[in-house]
């Protein structure tokens, strides 16, 4: 992250100050909402192509050979959502884990995050780096989908007072059934694959 900030200058760019942050409970429709917005072409989100160095999107873009999007494949959730290398995803959580992980991740729960000016400035740089790595850094808006954003709404609003925060709600019975199905599905996977348990 520090190397990215030293190497890639943001001077001369007029970045948009009105990103969109999507948050909500798991299985509430946040992924589909993000994808619909991303498909308008007006937003920059981190995608699978930014992996594994999501804190250095510009440096990784220079060093890696950008592959074509490739064929669409169903994601691990087996919920009918198809993904490719160009699909947006909630990779922003890496930033929060690295810079504030010990403040909100507990063994038995997650905790609301108190704002910290130094981290707030780093987050603004993180968003600008993501925009800078796009083909139209001065035109696109940053788009984030992260269910854990609910823990840091104060950060988001202090970082970007003009931001829009969207929290979708789903029919409670459908929502509960979807959560149960995913719990059963991933419990089976994690029983067979320890890496999956650590990753999730």
Where in the sequence are the language-model features?
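Extreme N-terminal, non-catalytic leader segments
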Residues: 1-19
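PAPS-dependent sulfation machinery
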Residues: 49-142
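Short catalytic/ligand-binding loop motif for oxyanion handling, primarily in non-cytosolic enzymes
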Residues: 29-31, 52-55, 151-153, 173-178
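PAPS-dependent sulfotransferase catalytic core
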Residues: 181-200
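P-loop (Walker A) phosphate-binding loop of NTP-binding proteins
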Residues: 25
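Conserved phosphate-donor/acceptor-positioning beta-strand/loop module used by diverse small-molecule
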Residues: 145-147, 156-181
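A conserved segment at the C-terminal end of the G1
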Residues: 31-44
């Amino acid at each position: 992250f520090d190397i990215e900030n030293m190497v890639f200058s943001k001077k001369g760019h007029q970045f948009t100050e009105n990103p969109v942050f999507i948050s909500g409970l798991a299985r509430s429709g946040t992924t589909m909402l993000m994808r619909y917005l991303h498909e308008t072409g007006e937003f920059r989100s981190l995608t699978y192509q930014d992996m594994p160095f999501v804190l250095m999107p510009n440096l990784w873009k220079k060093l890696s050979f950008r592959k074509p999007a490739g064929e669409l494949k169903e994601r691990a959730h087996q919920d009918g959502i198809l993904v490719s290398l160009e699909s947006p995803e909630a990779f922003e959580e890496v930033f929060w884990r690295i810079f504030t992980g010990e403040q909100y991740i507990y063994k038995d729960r997650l905790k609301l995050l108190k704002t910290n000016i130094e981290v707030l400035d780093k987050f603004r740089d993180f968003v600008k780096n993501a925009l800078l790595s796009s083909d139209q850094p001065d035109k696109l808006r940053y788009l984030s989908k992260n269910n854990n954003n609910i823990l840091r709404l104060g950060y988001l609003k202090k970082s970007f007072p003009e931001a829009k925060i969207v929290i979708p709600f789903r029919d409670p019975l459908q929502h509960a059934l979807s959560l149960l199905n995913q719990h059963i599905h991933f419990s089976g996977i994690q029983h067979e694959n320890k890496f999956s348990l650590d990753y999730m």
